[in-house]
């Protein structure tokens, strides 16, 4: 392969994803008629509209990474025969997609089946956070629908390379403060005799990112609707109620009632900054918010959720969250020594209702992480699609389903325990 031209150097905040070769994927189960040629045309149009998706990463002379343009066209969609594993258009990709950031930052894999199929889009995390990635998938289905219904994928206007978080913050005049926001956890560091916990072994092989185990649950549309209405009644978002439920569940399962729980979650800065930032205008435009949960037998979920929201609002008002990403390092080491185990959860982002042709329907969506990291991961992610709340646990802990079922039980019983009944 001929050497490509350097587009730009990865920023400090993006380098962590290159260091651990982090990809995210969205697996979509489809029911109905699939037109492979139309999907291929839509995917090609997506890449043409976002040329950075056809690039790859190379190490730089200073030990960092460069985003490099390819001289060759992106290989396109990979189609796999569900019966025998035979592939076409995969450029040598094996039956289990091999993710290699030195080759490609984007892969699309389709496995057609009778009556539908499975579509998996993989994207390197240095180029897209969850919001950015969801918008790309939405655009892919929109272009596919246009090809099927009109024969044309729609206008192709090449977009500029997305900016790093650092570049966007500099444009908006956001500067690094002395405090990162993590200082609120200092009071509990080495303050408790923490029980020893087993650490599962995680084998990391550079150049071969591995799938992080994931367990998930869905709330029904009615359960999600009841939860949203309950939140509105108490002026709380689903995010806040879910966060409180996760923390209360973790407190019960840990059996260390006297130990506070540090909680960290990302905040999408696109709509926090002024002027707002378009979803694909930046790669990972995230701040970090923190909360120290002090929970007891009498803790009320509404009070806990309300305090989480109040803390976030205060941290946004003083600008701590907006600049928190400027304190990020490029190494991931899990919970710092002496600190009670962190709880991390993404926000319950509402996925767009994606356009599909009349004879095709999306039945399920599942997210996943791939990386080559030796530190066990333990995090929750949430989302809402088609009116249903999805909660996932990503990581290597034992019995993740136990925690998820306890969270579900709490979320589904809270409205009735408060005497709230939908009219």
UniProtKB/Swiss-Prot annotation:
Kindly list the biological process annotations in GO that this record carries: lipid metabolic process
EC category name: transferase
The reaction(s) this protein catalyses:
2 a mycocerosyl-[mycocerosic acid synthase] + a phthiocerol = a dimycocerosyl phthiocerol + 2 holo-[mycocerosic acid synthase]; 2 a mycocerosyl-[mycocerosic acid synthase] + a phthiodiolone = a dimycocerosyl phthiodiolone + 2 holo-[mycocerosic acid synthase]; 2 a mycocerosyl-[mycocerosic acid synthase] + a phenolphthiocerol = a dimycocerosyl phenolphthiocerol + 2 holo-[mycocerosic acid synthase]
> Record's InterPro entries?
CAT-like_dom_sf (IPR023213), PapA_C (IPR031641)
- E.C. designation(s): 2.3.1.282
Q: Which residues form the active site?
A: 125 (proton acceptor)
Q: Which Pfam families match?
A: PapA_C
Per the UniProt record, the site (Structural role in the organization of the active site) maps to 129
Its annotated function is as follows: Catalyzes diesterification of phthiocerol, phthiodiolone, and phenolphthiocerol with mycocerosic acids, the final step in the phthiocerol, phthiodiolone and phenolphthiocerol dimycocerosate esters (PDIM) synthesis. Can directly transfer the mycocerosate bound to the mycocerosic acid synthase (mas) onto the substrate alcohols.
Subunit arrangement? Monomer. Interacts directly with the acyl carrier protein (ACP) domain of the mycocerosic acid synthase (mas) protein.
Annotated protein name in UniProt: Phthiocerol/phthiodiolone dimycocerosyl transferase
Q: Which organism is it from?
A: Mycobacterium leprae (strain TN)
| This protein's encoding gene | papA5
């Amino acid at each position: 392969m001929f050497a490509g031209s350097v587009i730009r150097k990865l920023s400090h905040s993006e380098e962590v994803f290159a260091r651990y070769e982090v990809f995210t994927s969205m697996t979509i189960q489809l029911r109905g008629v699939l037109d492979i040629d139309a999907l291929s045309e839509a995917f090609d149009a997506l890449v043409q509209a976002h040329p950075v998706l056809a690039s790859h990463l190379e190490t730089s002379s200073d030990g960092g990474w460069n985003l490099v343009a390819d001289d060759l066209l992106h290989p396109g969609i990979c189609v796999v025969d569900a019966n025998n594993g035979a592939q076409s258009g995969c450029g040598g990709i094996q039956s289990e997609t091999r993710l290699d950031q030195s080759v490609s930052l984007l892969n699309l894999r389709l496995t057609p089946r009778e009556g539908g199929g499975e579509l998996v889009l993989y994207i390197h995390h240095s180029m897209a956070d969850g919001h950015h990635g969801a918008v790309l998938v939405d655009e892919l289905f929109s272009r596919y629908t246009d090809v099927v219904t009109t024969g044309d994928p729609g206008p192709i206007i090449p977009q500029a390379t997305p900016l790093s978080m650092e570049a966007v913050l500099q444009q908006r005049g956001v500067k690094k403060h002395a405090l990162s926001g993590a200082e609120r956890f200092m009071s509990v560091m080495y303050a408790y005799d923490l029980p020893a916990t087993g650490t599962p072994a995680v084998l990391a092989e550079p150049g071969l990112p591995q799938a992080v185990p994931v367990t998930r649950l869905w709330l029904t549309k009615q359960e999600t609707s009841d939860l949203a209405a309950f939140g509105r009644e108490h002026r709380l978002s689903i995010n806040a109620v879910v966060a409180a439920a996760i923390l209360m569940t973790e407190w019960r399962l840990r059996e260390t009632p006297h130990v506070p729980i540090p909680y960290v979650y990302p905040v999408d800065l696109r709509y926090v900054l002024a002027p707002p930032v378009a979803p694909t205008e930046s790669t990972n435009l995230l701040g970090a918010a923190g909360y120290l949960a002090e929970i007891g037998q009498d803790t009320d979920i509404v009070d806990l959720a309300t305090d989480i929201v109040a803390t976030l609002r205060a941290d946004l008002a003083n600008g701590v969250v907006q600049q928190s990403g400027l304190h990020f390092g490029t190494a991931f080491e899990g919970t710092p020594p002496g600190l009670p185990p962190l709880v991390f959860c993404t926000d319950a982002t509402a996925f767009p209702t994606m356009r599909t042709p009349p004879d095709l329907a999306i039945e399920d969506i599942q997210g996943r992480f791939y990386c080559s990291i030796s530190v066990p991961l333990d995090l929750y992610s949430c989302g809402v699609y088609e009116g249903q709340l999805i909660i996932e646990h990503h990581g290597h802990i034992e019995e993740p389903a136990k925690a998820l079922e306890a969270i579900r039980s709490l979320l589904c019983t809270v409205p009735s325990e408060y005497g709230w009944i939908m009219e």
